[in-house]
From Swiss-Prot:
Cellular localization per UniProt: Secreted
Alphabetized UniProt keyword annotations: Developmental protein, Differentiation, Glycoprotein, Neurogenesis, Osteogenesis, Repeat, Secreted, Signal
CC per GO annotation: extracellular region; plasma membrane; synapse
Motif (Cell attachment site): 174-176
Keyword Signal tagged: yes
Protein's UniProt name: Chordin-like protein 1
Biological source species: Mus musculus (Mouse)
Gene giving rise to this polypeptide: Chrdl1
């Protein structure tokens, strides 16, 4: 039962961390939110702990104040010689008190590659990670209609004829010295017999050891970062990189680079052994292919003395906006202000001017892009990107802060200029329009 005690201990650590995160933002008078799932007041359930499955020895309930209360199941003392462990039940039973065979727990199943899997069922997926190493395999589990898959690095084996084991995509050695521990549902999970494989296997924070020592905390389906790829910081043998696959989306849209897994659309700087992180190259995961491009720095900067900053490819202008009449909260005459950035790039007679507004609700950056050639507007468009993606763009300079009303005036004037400058030469009209975003000092320091 040491393995089960270990799993329960991990769960209560997770409950503490989960509760501290959700107390302020996940509170509601009518429901509780736990592991990104809503529960009604009074509703009870067994929590799901990846990759062990449902923890039947823990009961959770949604209290009236919106808090999740979880408690360990206390098993009664049995007075029979051979108690029986039953799947989907925590406590063993005496043979004469077994429940009916058709008493099944129903949960939402998963559909993957034409096969239906039940909630809590583990299986092996082929072809999910296109660039996996020969000693790696992908193991998946079904949880409430979602498929959770992990890229697992298998331990090095020293035997000639390894065997397959239940609920694991890695093969292990068969031997007299095999140890075992109880799985969450009472199944027996075999540990590699040879010393080297066993030592490597125990370094995985996802696999329960036979006694009490653990390599670290596992990742849970309810973790806040589980949208896209979740990357384990350890790169040792036996680690798992966990991703979430939603049944409504295509499977296998991930890329693996330098031992790390990235979801479709995610960007990163490559890490080369000889050079470290290459800041001037940006790679993007396109379905399962990596597309890497060199970052081109501008020849001219809107400031006189751009600075080189560690971790950035291109030089950047110092972020010192003009002195304006803002209070300590960044407001102007009681109205909330938002940062405005500008970028000007000139090449071969073509000027690309970008004006960006950073907002908090929603948390994004709205970028207005003007492409002008010989004074004639060639192209104009607006794009909205995340703050994280905007942070990867190093050619923007913080120029001022503005209010929502001033930004509306800017966009209205911009719409007029986009029509006028497409048919006649515009030299300074756009530069003049940007001045609308600058907030002047109120007369006599009164609003």
């Amino acid at each position: 039962m040491d393995g089960m005690k270990y799993i329960i201990s991990l769960f209560f650590i997770f409950v503490f961390l989960e509760g501290s995160k959700t107390e302020q933002v996940k509170h509601s008078d009518t429901y509780c939110v736990f592991q990104d799932k809503k529960y009604r007041v009074g509703e009870k359930w067994h929590p799901y702990l990846e990759p062990y499955g449902l923890v039947y020895c823990v009961n959770c309930i949604c209290s009236e104040n919106g808090n999740v209360l979880c408690s360990r199941v206390r098993c009664p003392s049995l007075h029979c010689l051979s108690p029986v462990h039953i799947p989907h039940l925590c406590c063993p039973r005496c043979p004469d008190s077994l429940p009916p065979v058709n008493n099944k727990v129903t949960s939402k199943s998963c559909e993957y590659n034409g096969t239906t899997y039940q909630h809590g069922e583990l299986f092996i997926a082929e072809g999910l990670f296109q660039n996996r190493q020969p000693n790696q395999c992908s193991q998946c589990s079904c949880s409430e209609g979602n498929v959770y898959c992990g890229l697992k690095t298998c331990p090095k084996l020293t035997c000639a004829f390894p065997v397959s084991v239940p609920d694991s995509c890695c093969r292990v050695c068969r031997g007299d010295a095999e140890l075992s521990w109880e799985h969450a549902d009472g199944d027996i999970f075999r540990q590699p017999a040879n010393r080297e494989a066993r030592h490597s296997y125990l370094r995985s924070p996802y696999d329960p050891p036979p006694n009490r020592q653990a390599g670290g905390l596992p990742r849970f389906p309810g973790s806040r970062s589980h949208r896209g790829a979740v990357i384990d910081s350890q790169q040792a043998s036996g680690t798992i990189v966990q991703i979430v696959i939603n049944n409504k989306h295509k499977h296998g849209q991930v890329c693996v680079s330098n031992g790390k897994t990235y979801s479709h659309g995610e960007s990163w700087h490559p890490n080369l052994r000889a050079f470290g992180i290459v800041e001037c190259v940006l790679c993007t995961c396109n379905v399962t292919k990596q597309e890497c491009k060199k970052i081109h720095c501008p020849n001219r900067y809107p400031c006189k003395y751009p600075q080189k900053i560690d971790g950035k490819c291109c030089k950047v202008c110092p972020e010192e906006p003009p002195s304006q009449n803002f209070d300590s909260k960044g407001s102007f005459c009681g109205e909330e202000t938002m940062p405005v950035y500008e970028s000007v790039f000139m090449e071969d007679g073509e000027t690309t001017r970008k004006v960006a507004l950073e907002t908090e609700r929603p948390p994004q950056v709205e970028v207005h892009v003007w492409t002008i050639q010989k004074g004639i507007l060639q192209h104009f468009h607006i794009e909205k990107i995340s703050k994280r993606m905007f942070g990867e763009l190093h050619h923007f300079k913080l120029v001022t802060r503005t209010t929502l009303n001033q930004w509306k005036l800017f966009t209205e004037g911009e719409a007029q200029l986009s029509q006028m400058c497409s048919s006649q030469v515009c030299r300074t009209e756009l530069e003049d329009l940007v001045q609308v975003l600058y907030l002047g000092r109120p007369e006599k320091d009164h609003c």
